[in-house]
């Protein structure tokens, strides 16, 4: 817990230096390989770069100070899905062949 608090303080300090203010944080259940975030209403859709087994995380951000992971989806073997868009009521996500080969030993 002490390490997490130190990391959050470091992030907050870095954000303030750049003119931003940290409002909330999610570690995405330990899968921090986020590549793109799209917000629609009270939800944030996070595309993962493909280092973890995840392709998409959905967070409830109705309370920005305390975002909550609602659902996470795994990518197919040998693929990554690092982009996400929302058009109307449709979520669109890419599915690309991984260029780095099959990863079988996720942390």
Model segments located where?
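Feature marking well-ordered beta-strand scaffolds used for ligand recognition
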Residues: 1-107
